[in-house]
């Protein structure tokens, strides 16, 4: 009998082990591995607060006031996520603010979102708390003692570590505590209660939905209040995963959206049903923030961590009281003080590391991401090593679209309509990009046919609309049209998700790494469509890209608009913003709240007109556009003019200004293919083209049609099982012709290049007549340059000789240097050009500017004297184009004899001191209003002159000093340019 029992026990144990092994194996199937790596440290602090809620801000402020060094990572592009995200902007009867911060927030109730966001910004700035927007915690750091030692966060600059003694988790669902291994109650399957606010429109009714009209009207800038409806919904949930919440969000919008609405909650509100297990538990009523035991906010068996939110170990009735903003802020102050006190008693964490173990991966490959850091120093950041570890798979689809904007939403719709299992990821909480979230709700130009026409007709199909200030389409309706069409086509939509890496095997992209409010994971896909507008996924996957660098700061102007509730078209151009730089984006949001402080709200999408671009299988140039080049693989017809929002750099435009005439442009499929990578397509501003070609192919109608084409192409890849380069292009074109995206002639088009040599020769002959035919001459330099040299030698007039010398010089040819030198010497300064963003057309160099640049590029010894004579005549009142011209010319010559003259120019009154190295300078030196050229003119002039001085050998360290100041500038393009210039010389 004893033996029998032993056998039973052994058998049972074996079965249990097998079951456990099976579960483990199943878990391992749902992961991939990332190789060992070193993560840059962004901040070393006493206390890190994760989450930009009112409570989180109150905690950060109090901790700082108690002497702690504090950093706050906000998930959204603003602070006040607990108020503005779910639209809980009002106080309930009997709630009265008592603290200074609370009184500022609720000067009126409901509070305007701008009032909330700006007040919280100022609270952190005044307290000396560093903070960033758009940052998701992805991992928890630990030290040798196993103690929590900070977090790892992901944002559009990649992934960075924050070392800290104490962590305050102010996220809605205690995501950091979950990462740290804290124990939580179950999130049961079944129906759960959520709330959603809709402003304007009629009350919706139905099953599992109740509505009440909010007693207080939503205040509108310069107008009457708007009525808000609070919906209470019961929605079936499979579990507490992010995917389940993403699905619930779509169900809630299906049930509550109305054509008359003007705004709505960004996310659902729920009292979390799955609290953590704390050191202590509160089962009764809420005793008040000043009386509650602090141990209910400390996870059991986890030190140095506070949970500041509804997942605390308190009754759900108490949690409801806690999540009211006044109580949350009071509690935040208590927790902030406790965290500061705890940090004071702790030594700094030692041997900080990122825990984790490798898994048996479901597929081979590795995670690629940006680990360059976000600092403004010239030294390498310290780093934290992490061993090889598993990254969970959050989903597997046919097509994943990263970015639901102008190109991404159409790509998702078309891919899903073609039968591909499609997932669209979007960081913001609305689809459509610059035309909706960016408030640029009018077409300037574009090919308004095909899918774009379907969009416009779909929006009109919602019915009559009110007239709005600024005109344009109804952004709420356009967002909803995209969303509903994705839903109809069977696509999934995940809002609040950031693409932060690529999963790659060899040269094939097999998925995208994402950061969600609940953590980091991988979406595996047969095709990735990078619709970030910034080639974010392609860049980290290994695609070669072009952007501002050491060559210059030529970038189209950017904006960030004020938002008036129910408004129409709102276009701004007041700065440069680098989408890849989380510090610069933070600067823009903080400054914009100062610029537009009296309006209802601020837009959440940075309206950049130029971003990082891939080097694709084909790189479109201005010459392709000007010569109406055709291709066998055209998939988009673009229509626009050269609306450059700044200055141009291509030789053709430095010689002959672009005009405002309408141009139709063929865009080939190869512009969407990153050279050397498979499994990925890139859309929007990230496609492969010269920066001076982008103004003509970036119009919204054309990006919408381009996204549609990319989605169809991706579905064809899935169906055929081939690579992105092997699809049947003619079949794709036929579909697009049937859709009316393309004219039928593209089916028989061939590449019209190379141009016949006879055409080049004819153009060289007539180019002396006001540069007629210049676009043909510059299309094939290998054929044109010998002809230009001969034409210069044979020219029988000074005008012709100068024209040929001018072109040759601009191309770096020394032939004709003496002619150019004489022309520069004999002319007085003409009318120059100051930086212009909005409405910039034509030349951005004067005629003399252009001659000076051409002379400098000859690298002739004859060039220096005439150019230095011109430098002496310049001062702070001189136009930017003159300063830019002499800087380009002199740095090209690189003669140390030019250094003293450049230094003397820089020392003239008003030339230097224009870097924004702290946020106070950025806030108060940026003028109010939707446009600004003053600060850009000042900084561009100072920077190009300092760069030229530095490259000419410098003089008494003046150039290096200025460049080092700009290397710390909060404006990302200036900072990267300055750092690159300094690094390039150091490397040499």
Language-model features, listed with the residues they occupy:
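Bacterial N-terminal signal peptides that target proteins for export
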Residues: 1-9
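Bacterial N-terminal signal peptides
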Residues: 8-20
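Flavin (FAD/FMN)-binding glycine-rich loop and adjacent Rossmann-like elements that form
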Residues: 24-27, 32-33, 38, 82, ...
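Conserved N-terminal/central alpha/beta ligand/cofactor-binding core
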Residues: 42, 62, 68-69, 73-143, ...
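Beta1/beta-strand and adjacent pyrophosphate-binding region of the FAD-binding site
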Residues: 42-53, 393-405
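N-terminal Rossmann-fold NAD(P) dinucleotide-binding loop
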Residues: 56, 408
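Amphipathic alpha-helical scaffolding segments comprising HEAT/armadillo-like alpha-solenoid repeats
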Residues: 751-764, 781-793, 813-837, 860-874, ...
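Structural detector for internal amphipathic alpha-helices that build alpha-solenoid repeat scaffolds
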Residues: 769-782, 790-794, 798-814, 834-860, ...
């Amino acid at each position: 009998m004893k033996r029998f029992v032993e056998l039973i026990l052994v058998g049972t144990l074996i079965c249990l082990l097998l079951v456990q092994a099976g579960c483990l194996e199943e878990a391992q199937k749902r992961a991939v591995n990332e190789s060992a790596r070193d993560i840059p440290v962004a901040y070393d602090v006493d206390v890190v607060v994760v989450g930009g809620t009112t409570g989180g801000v109150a905690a950060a402020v109090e901790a700082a006031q108690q002497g702690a060094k504090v950093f706050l990572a906000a998930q959204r592009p603003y602070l006040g996520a607990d108020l503005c995200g779910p639209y809980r902007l009002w106080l309930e009867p009997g709630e009265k603010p008592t603290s200074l911060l609370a009184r500022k927030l609720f000067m009126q109730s409901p509070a305007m979102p701008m009032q909330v966001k700006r007040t919280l910004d100022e609270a952190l700035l005044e307290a000396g708390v560093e903070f960033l927007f758009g940052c998701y915690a992805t991992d928890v750091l630990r030290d040798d003692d196993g103690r929590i030692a900070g977090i790892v966060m992901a944002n559009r600059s990649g992934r960075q570590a924050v070392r800290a003694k104490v962590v305050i988790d102010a996220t809605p669902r205690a995501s950091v505590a979950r990462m740290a291994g804290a124990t939580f109650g179950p999130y049961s399957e079944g129906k759960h209660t959520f709330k959603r606010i809709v402003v304007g429109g009629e009350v919706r009714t139905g099953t599992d939905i109740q509505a009440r009209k909010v007693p207080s009207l939503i205040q509108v800038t310069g107008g009457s209040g708007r009525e808000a409806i609070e919906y209470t919904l019961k929605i079936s949930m499979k579990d507490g995963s992010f995917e389940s919440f993403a699905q619930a969000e779509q169900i809630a919008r299906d049930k509550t959206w109305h054509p008359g609405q003007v705004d709505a909650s960004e996310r659902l509100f729920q009292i979390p049903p799955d609290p953590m297990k704390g050191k202590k538990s509160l089962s009764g009523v809420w005793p008040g923030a000043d009386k509650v035991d602090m141990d209910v906010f400390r996870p059991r068996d986890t030190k140095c961590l506070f949970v500041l939110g509804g997942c605390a170990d308190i009754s759900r009735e108490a949690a409801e009281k806690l999540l009211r903003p006044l109580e949350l802020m009071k509690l935040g102050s208590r927790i902030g003080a406790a965290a500061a006190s705890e940090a004071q008693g702790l030594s700094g964490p030692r041997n900080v590391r990122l825990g984790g173990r490798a898994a048996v991966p479901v597929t081979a490959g590795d995670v690629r991401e940006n680990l360059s850091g976000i600092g403004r120093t010239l030294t390498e950041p310290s780093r934290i090593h992490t061993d090889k570890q598993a990254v969970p798979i959050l989903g597997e689809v046919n097509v994943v679209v990263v970015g639901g904007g102008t190109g991404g939403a159409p790509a998702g719709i078309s891919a899903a309509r073609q039968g591909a299992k499609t997932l669209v990821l979007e960081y913001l909480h609305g689809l459509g990009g610059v035309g909706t979230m960016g408030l640029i709700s009018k077409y300037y130009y574009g090919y308004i046919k095909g899918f774009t026409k379907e969009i416009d007709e779909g929006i009109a199909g919602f019915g009559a609309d009110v007239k709005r200030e600024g005109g344009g389409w109804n952004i709420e309706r356009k967002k909803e049209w995209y969303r509903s069409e994705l839903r109809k086509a069977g696509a999934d939509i995940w809002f609040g998700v950031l693409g932060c890496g690529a999963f790659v095997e060899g040269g094939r992209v097999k998925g995208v790494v994402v950061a969600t409010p609940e953590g980091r994971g991988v979406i595996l896909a047969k095709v990735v469509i990078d619709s970030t507008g910034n080639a974010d996924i392609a860049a980290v996957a290994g695609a070669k890209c072009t952007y501002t660098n050491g060559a210059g700061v030529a970038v189209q102007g950017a904006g960030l608009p004020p938002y008036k509730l129910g408004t129409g078209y709102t276009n701004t151009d007041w700065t440069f913003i680098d989408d890849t730089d989380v510090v610069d984006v933070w600067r823009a949001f903080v400054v914009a709240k100062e610029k537009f402080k009296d309006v209802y709200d601020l837009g959440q999408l940075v309206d950049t007109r130029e971003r990082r671009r891939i080097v694709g299988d084909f790189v479109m140039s201005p010459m392709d556009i000007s010569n109406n080049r055709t291709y066998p693989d055209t998939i988009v017809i673009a229509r626009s003019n050269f609306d450059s929002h700044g200055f141009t750099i291509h030789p053709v435009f430095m010689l002959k200004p672009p005009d405002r005439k309408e141009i139709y442009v063929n865009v080939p499929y190869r512009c969407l293919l990153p050279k050397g990578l498979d499994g990925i397509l890139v859309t929007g501003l990230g496609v492969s083209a010269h920066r001076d070609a982008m103004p003509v192919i970036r119009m919204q109608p054309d990006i919408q049609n381009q996204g549609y084409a990319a989605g169809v192409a991706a579905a064809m890849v899935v169906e055929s099982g081939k690579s992105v380069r092997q699809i049947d292009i003619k079949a794709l074109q036929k579909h697009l012709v049937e859709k009316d995206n393309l004219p039928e002639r593209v089916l028989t088009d061939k590449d019209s290049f190379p141009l016949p040599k006879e055409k080049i020769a004819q153009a060289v002959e007539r180019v002396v007549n006001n540069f007629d035919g210049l676009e043909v001459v510059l299309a094939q330099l290998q054929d044109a340059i010998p002809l230009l040299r001969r034409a210069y030698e044979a020219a029988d007039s000074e005008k012709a000789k100068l024209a040929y010398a001018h072109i040759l010089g601009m191309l770096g040819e020394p032939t004709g240097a003496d002619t150019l030198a004489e022309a520069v010497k004999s002319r007085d300064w003409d009318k120059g050009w100051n930086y212009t963003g909005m409405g910039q057309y034509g030349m951005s160099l004067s005629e003399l500017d252009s001659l000076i640049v051409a002379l400098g590029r000859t690298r002739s010894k004859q060039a220096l004297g005439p150019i230095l004579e011109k430098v002496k005549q310049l001062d702070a009142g001189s136009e930017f184009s003159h300063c830019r011209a002499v800087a380009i010319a002199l740095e090209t010559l690189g003669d140390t004899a030019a250094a003293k003259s450049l230094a003397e120019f820089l020392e003239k009154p008003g030339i230097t001191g224009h870097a924004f190295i702290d946020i106070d300078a950025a806030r108060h030196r940026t003028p109010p209003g939707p446009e600004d050229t003053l600060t850009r003119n000042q900084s561009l002039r100072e920077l190009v002159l300092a760069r030229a001085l530095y490259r000419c050998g410098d003089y008494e360290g003046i150039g290096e000093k200025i460049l080092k100041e700009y290397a710390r500038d909060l404006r990302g393009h200036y900072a990267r340019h300055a750092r690159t210039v300094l690094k390039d010389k150091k490397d040499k």
